[in-house]
């Protein structure tokens, strides 16, 4: 199927189409729609919904350039998330709606309206940034790593040992990477073009992934302790880079000090932090039934105070002195605060954002949501999403080797992969990003792979890797380099993807490193790639094309 999209009217939330990307409530905003010559628009109106009630604003023809008419209207931003869409009447008596999903003859759903978000401006440094994801145990070891005493749970491995295929032992396999090793390799990360270092959890735990925290008070001594994090962040900041932490607000480990204080102890202050299934507090709700990961109960005011609310909370502590993290990626954000009839997720995420803003308004908040994330990402808290539905899945399904089986992890997170053509990939992408306000879309992670899924290269057809990396770097969002992608590492599932980096073979990876560096450098030199709009031009089986547009210029991208 070949789809030509260049002849459709277009609008998005970028500066070429919206006069103020970060308005305050009560401010007036002008919006423009681009209508190709010959489409035949005779009247254009903007439908807004102040306080939920539809209201129409007349647009006027506002200049033209060769082959294009511009229509413009102004309205007042009445609500924190202000929805709008366009109605375009034609000379032949027909009318079409234009919303974030595209052009429609029939009335579309309100959920896919364009949205302007008022207040709580995301940090400017996140626009156009490139992220590098670090899994500390497998990234690099500093000179002092080997001198640390290992806990009982750890099963030591040599750096060149393969990941244990017996998944009963994988989480305990300990390679000894630490934060000092990350600091020593900042040259490498920056050389790839990355300016955000995203660290998976650094708190003490009983696994190498550390998503089963046993405390949030200190950095794991196995990673070098608090001092190592302070040193890493200072070194990164000295280079103009940012460091993002990883915090799990859905659960902790069953060895966590709060859980240990409550387990089997009815009446303990921490009892209200968890969901108990018996009066003795010996059985409890956990993440997906995994007993080592008890689930937090966010009905507890004391849990909120200790963990997410105010200057003394865990959320605040690591953003302030002396640590100065630049933000959080929240693990399992989609499940946080949700259990049966409880849905405290909106409250929890807004409290986290408010606390972060009070400590340092120049911090970034990303939430993990593995599926359709739009409903939770209206711009009220999360600046962007770590999701697989809008970028990862369409790119995989288009550029995978036809008929190749889905690896473990990917199927769990985003469903079984399929064989799609380019037009399918574009259609799916447009479907899933339609619900994001523009400022959320530009800060949502474009990940080809992560620590939770197979490596893209495992499934990619010949020649597809440069195309996929190019899409990650040029589509709206935060491109993500998962450690090891630049080495061409493989991985059949999430665990197998966490292979220690082969620093001794750095020279053999230079071509791929250069690929990342060249593509990332475009984001420094082309303002269209930071927050510029995206207008689709073409989609067919083997090629897609789009224009990234900004007041400074237009960049046309063709992927084939």
Question: What kind of region is each of these model predictions?
Answer:
Residues 33, 134, 189, 199, ...:
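Conserved, mostly hydrophobic/aromatic
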Residues 135-195, 202-323, 348, 352-358, ...:
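Substrate-binding/active-site clefts of carbohydrate-active enzymes
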Residues 251, 313-339, 446-450:
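Active-site groove signature of glycoside hydrolases
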Residues 15-16, 21-28, 529-553:
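Surface beta-strand/loop "capping" patches
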Residues 129-134, 196, 240-244, 325-329, ...:
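Structural preference for beta-strand elements that scaffold enzyme active sites
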Residues 431, 500-539:
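Aromatic- and carboxylate-lined catalytic core of secreted/periplasmic carbohydrate-active enzymes
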Residues 101-103, 254-270, 315, 319-320, ...:
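Conserved alpha/beta catalytic core and glycan-binding cleft of carbohydrate-active enzymes
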Residues 1-132:
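Glycan-association/targeting regions that enable binding to alpha-glucans and other polysaccharides
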